[in-house]
């Protein structure tokens, strides 16, 4: 019975300490970039294959394309090229890998993502024949159209000057920043880009501090905290101390458990050997008595069998209500499902094999020396 305590103690150590060690371990979240020219990815963004998923917020997953360009995949669109990330104002500048952002905007829907337009207005896309007389307020979209027709974009309120040969293709709410850049600087660097913003998680105050970065408090929470280290999660002193303490305790406790288990197993084996030796000696003494002995000192088999015999349950409580846990003859603990026999009158109980061997040699209780009477039905 006692040998079963060893694996139980070991299981308790593993179940308690190892989840605690895992929960206390905060993986480092270094900044990464796909190349020297690409944007730097850090919280709330995480760079797939280069940073642990726990380093980024849900919906802020970046991927390296061709080992040089950084892309962002939104739920309802194909990946965008990431040209710039402003962590202090929480804005991101996106581009189309095919250099035709206008085509992407015709079906663009940022819902379902953490991003939204900085400002949006309704704009109208027109299709006009090549020979149409177009005013300066209409901006051509060179990457759309074909040999016979062209696409133009115009603010909704300027539709009054639309030539009769043109027709409306689509009216869409689009980022105002894209249209201003497109119409003001049609050949400039930002003319094909789109700015989006995110509001959650809000790390703007933290980003404005010197050498401060946002990050998760721990691996099991979505709460954000401002760290003084440039690598949030690396210098969480409390968690590191807890981890060291746990590691310091696991080794000694495991060794102590093994030692206790060995002592318990050895004690159990010794008790078992004593019990077997007592039974063997008593049994041998009985069989060695001369067959022609006239007067038997012990009790006969029928009298012994008349005394109460009970199989112990999980509580190992004796049927007499006694709190004894050790057999007085062999001095080993009672175990579940072991059989005990109790003597009448004095109500002392023993292992069945122990007391049976004793009573074959002696007619008195080995504890109180009283002579039990045979029970009659």
UniProtKB/Swiss-Prot annotation:
It catalyses: S-ubiquitinyl-[E2 ubiquitin-conjugating enzyme]-L-cysteine + [acceptor protein]-L-lysine = [E2 ubiquitin-conjugating enzyme]-L-cysteine + N(6)-ubiquitinyl-[acceptor protein]-L-lysine. Gene3D superfamilies: Zinc/RING finger domain, C3HC4 (zinc finger). One of its GO terms (cellular component) is membrane. CDD domains: RING-H2_EL5-like. Residues 1-23 form the signal peptide. Pathway: Protein modification; protein ubiquitination. A zinc finger (RING-type) spans 327-369. SUPFAM superfamilies: RING/U-box. The chain crosses the membrane at residues 244-264. It is found in: Membrane. It comes from the Eukaryota. One of its GO terms (biological process) is protein ubiquitination. The RING-type zinc finger domain mediates binding to an E2 ubiquitin-conjugating enzyme. InterPro entries: ATL20-22-like (IPR046948), WAK_GUB (IPR025287), Znf_RING (IPR001841), Znf_RING/FYVE/PHD (IPR013083). This is RING-H2 finger protein ATL22. Its EC number is 2.3.2.27. Belongs to the RING-type zinc finger family. ATL subfamily.
């Amino acid at each position: 019975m006692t040998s079963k305590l060893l694996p139980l103690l070991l299981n308790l150590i593993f179940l308690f300490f190892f989840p605690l060690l895992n929960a206390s371990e905060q993986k480092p979240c270094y900044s990464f970039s796909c190349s020297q020219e690409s944007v730097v990815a850090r919280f709330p963004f995480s760079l797939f294959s280069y940073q642990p998923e726990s380093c980024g917020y849900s919906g802020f997953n970046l991927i390296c394309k061709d080992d040089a360009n950084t892309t962002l995949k939104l739920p309802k669109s194909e990946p965008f090229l990431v040209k710039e990330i402003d962590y202090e104002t929480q804005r991101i500048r996106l581009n189309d890998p095919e250099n035709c952002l206008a085509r992407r905007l015709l079906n663009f829907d940022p819902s379902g993502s953490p991003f939204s337009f900085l400002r949006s207005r309704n704009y109208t896309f027109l299709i006009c024949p090549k020979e149409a007389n177009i005013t300066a307020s209409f901006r051509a979209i060179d990457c759309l159209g074909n040999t016979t027709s062209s696409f133009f974009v115009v603010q909704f309120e300027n539709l009054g000057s639309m030539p009769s040969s043109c027709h409306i293709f689509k009216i869409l709410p689009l980022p105002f920043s894209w249209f201003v850049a497109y119409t003001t600087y049609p050949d400039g660097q930002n003319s094909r880009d789109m700015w989006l913003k995110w509001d959650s998680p809000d790390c703007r105050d933290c980003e404005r501090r010197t050498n401060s970065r946002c990050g998760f408090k721990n691996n099991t929470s979505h709460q954000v905290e401002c760290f003084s280290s440039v690598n949030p999660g690396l210098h969480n002193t409390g968690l590191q101390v807890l981890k060291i303490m746990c590691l310091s305790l696991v080794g000694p406790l495991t060794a102590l458990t093994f030692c206790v288990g060995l002592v318990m197993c050895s004690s159990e084996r010794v008790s078992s050997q004593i019990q077997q030796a007592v039974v063997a000696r008593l049994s041998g003494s009985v069989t060695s008595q001369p067959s022609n002995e006239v007067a038997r000192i012990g009790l006969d088999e029928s009298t012994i069998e008349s005394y109460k015999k009970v199989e112990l349950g999980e509580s190992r409580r004796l049927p007499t209500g006694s709190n004894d846990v050790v057999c007085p003859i062999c001095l080993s603990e009672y175990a579940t499902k072991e059989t005990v026999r109790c003597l009448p009158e004095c109500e002392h109980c023993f292992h069945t094999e122990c007391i049976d061997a004793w009573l074959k040699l002696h007619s008195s209780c080995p504890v109180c020396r009283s002579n039990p009477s045979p029970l009659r039905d």
